[in-house]
Amino acid sequence: MRLENREGRPTSGVLEMELPQASAPSRAGLGSLGLVGLDSSNHRPQQGGSKAGSRGPYLSGAAGQSCWVPMDQDFGPFLTERRSHCPFPKHFSSRSKDPCFTENTPLLGSFSQEEGSRCIPVYRPEFITADEPWENSSAEWEGGALLSTELAVSSGSASTEKGELLDSAHIRCHLSKLRCCVQWLKVSGLFVFVVLCSILFSLYPDQGKFWQLLAVSPLESYSVNLSSHADSMLLQVDLAGALVASGPSHLGKEEHVAVEVTQANAPGSRRRRPQQVTHNWTIFLNPSGGEHTVMSRTFEVLSREPVSINIRASLQQTQIVPLLMAHQYLRASIEAQVTIAAVILAGVYVLIIFEIVHRTLAAMLGSLAALAALAVIGDRPTLTQVVEWIDFETLALLFGMMILVAIFSETGFFDYCAVKAYQLSRGRVWAMIIMLCLIAAVLSAFLDNVTTALLFTPVTIRLCEVLNLDPRQVLIAEVIFTNIGGAATAIGDPPNVIIVSNQELRKMGLDFAGFTAHMFAGICFVLLFSFPLLRLLYWNRKLYNKEPSEIVELKHEIHVWRLTAQRISPASREETAVRGLLLEKVLSLERLLARRLHSFHRQISQEDKNWETNIQELQKKHRISDRTLLTKCVTVLGLVIFMFFLNSFVPGVHLDLGWIAILGAIWLLILADIHDFEIILHRVEWATLLFFAALFILMEALAHLHLIEYVGEQTALLIKMVPEDQRLAAAIIVVVWVSAIASSLIDNIPFTATMIPVLLNLSRDPEISLPAPPLMYALALGACLGGNGTLIGASANVVCAGIAEQHGYGFSFMEFFRLGFPMMVVSCMVGMCYLLVAHVVMGWN
């Protein structure tokens, strides 16, 4: 397009527009170039260019399609051309000789009736697909789609531009076909994988465990001979009773059970008689009785000879010990099982990192693959066992708190908190972000991280909407500091609770007060280094949205309306009609957005100069909508949080966190007098709950495949290789980083439970003689801070991402990884240095 006067200089008097056309079989060449002129004096279409009339009418199948509307005040002096998926007339002129274009032609006749009408091509926003994000639409509007008066080029350059547009159209066509092929391959591959896992899982039956009751004493032992299977590589022996994972250091003075597994080795060519190989397994008894504990151990099957199991007891106070024993053969070695588990875990992370499927579906696929692997090796669990693997306490906590937050949000309290936070920060964005992160870290030290994320995420989202900030960046920073603050106390994070609850560690002096004092000092140093690092990582990132708040809110409103329409299943005629009305609403909002995108151009500074004026406007707009309901919500939520504290310090309260959250949700549902319960259920993040359920099954299946046990054993071997004078420092470094990396990849709860007996055995080994408390502090720091490494490394990360996605601000795995992983590395480095100074230099053991 170019604007020229009769003297050849660019002007607004004559407007020439060229439309690139695709080739057609009946025409020669790749396309035709048509010029339409608009006289600025009388606004009548006229022939522009001497060769315009000789080129004939335009061909069908334009490479770039446009919809033509009159120019008015909403659009300004812009001319926009954009591809769409609808046919349109290629040429409009009152003097056109083409019989295909008349006054009755759609989109043309109504505009040509009035003499003073001027027409421009405008992109039709209703043809935006669901896969095309609105974040990129404004850049395309303002950049590649505007035809301005600065493009004064010759006819030769116009032909070059036409060829480039045709090449671009071909490239887009090929990319579209490639995307279709990739989509087809993805669906086909995943379907074949699921079918294969289902077949493998169904081919091998559930063997079940036959538990045999036996009684052992110092005078009587129990012996049994087992016939070996041809395809067996391992023998797994399970014992159940009043057992403990590890015993005190004085092994000879404590009651224990000794298990001997003996088998004849396969005879070699030079041996006439097979050699007997005996494996010993010592299990310590709980002197107080305690609860029923199941312990397992695998032994290598050396040959097809029968296996002999002998169990005897070393007792002092009791006369006889009742036990339950079961055994089963496995068809894969430890190394093969660990390899299978690592491949499954890597596959799950590939699905999540590259967003091939939703993270919930990725966890479900990983669980199915792990269950199929267990079935193949001969350890297929029953449905009852799989359900028992799910941590229902965590799910109950999530569900109850989601109900509380859903009702709480109806009061307008989150909007009020957002305005107050803006007022306290006096319009300074970074002061507000640091204040939010610090409050989240302090609260998570005394509350569960999941509870803190559930309470803070809606407030942060509303605050960012008020200030025209990108909520994703603020939410990621906030949840990172939530995980850091949770490591400060013994009740802030589940790994800390597991460590403090261990009876053997309590006997060593690792109680609640000592653990909290030691960890709190280390986390303070971590916070001092984390805040400057956060500012450094966000140095070149614009936290403000690139567009005005009106445009951002309108785009978000379109996204929410579209999601609402997609979630309505057309099961009845009324629901189909409602879905149609919602889609019409989406189209009307997209048209409104298209008009507003051409009338706004604003640069936003990093500090709001008019924050006092904005505060007055925001206080009028965002108020408490229901004070009665707010009073009820604050009362119930305060009581729930008080019970959380009471549960940690008062042993007489026989309610765990899940029960407290569920009871609080029931109380608030009664007080709020909720009639339409389905509205509240729609606010629950069911995808997040399913993700946690699938993740619990996946982690437990990987534990049955000996992945976590293998990591612990390799960690112990690595520590033993270090010289004795440097062993404590090496042990702290190894435990911190192994725990951090493992916790960023797998759930930190089973990893912590597995590493505690491994580290206790290291501390009791006379060849190593390491103090246990420094190892436990290193384990706690690594397990808690390692959750910041990936999106699924901590429960709070997943909860925050789920709530943000429900509000239309979901962030991907890589978006979290770009900030979370550097923060994890630096925080673990600072925590490691603190432990080295405290325990190696100062000797605080």
From Swiss-Prot:
Keyword ATP-binding tagged: no
Chief localization: membrane
CDD domains recorded: P_permease (cd01116)
Keyword field: Membrane, Transmembrane, Transmembrane helix, Transport
GO cellular component: melanosome membrane
Name listed for the protein in its UniProt record: P protein
Membrane-spanning ranges: 184-204, 338-358, 361-381, 394-414, 430-450, 514-534, 630-650, 652-672, 688-708, 731-751, 774-794, 821-841
Organism: Sus scrofa
Function: Contributes to a melanosome-specific anion (chloride) current that modulates melanosomal pH for optimal tyrosinase activity required for melanogenesis and the melanosome maturation. One of the components of the mammalian pigmentary system. May serve as a key control point at which ethnic skin color variation is determined. Major determinant of brown and/or blue eye color. Seems to regulate the post-translational processing of tyrosinase, which catalyzes the limiting reaction in melanin synthesis.
Compositionally skewed regions (Low complexity) per UniProt: 26-40
Family: Belongs to the CitM (TC 2.A.11) transporter family.
Region (Disordered): 1-57
Residue numbers on the Cytoplasmic membrane side: 205-337, 382-393, 451-513, 651, 709-730, 795-820
Catalytic activity: chloride(in) = chloride(out)
InterPro entries: Cit_transptr-like_dom, Diverse_Ion_Transporter
Pfam families, per database record: CitMHS (PF03600)
Gene Ontology MF annotations: chloride channel activity
Gene: Oca2
Gene Ontology BP terms: lysosomal lumen pH elevation; melanin biosynthetic process; melanin biosynthetic process from tyrosine; melanocyte differentiation
Extracellular membrane side: 1-183, 359-360, 415-429, 535-629, 673-687, 752-773, 842-845
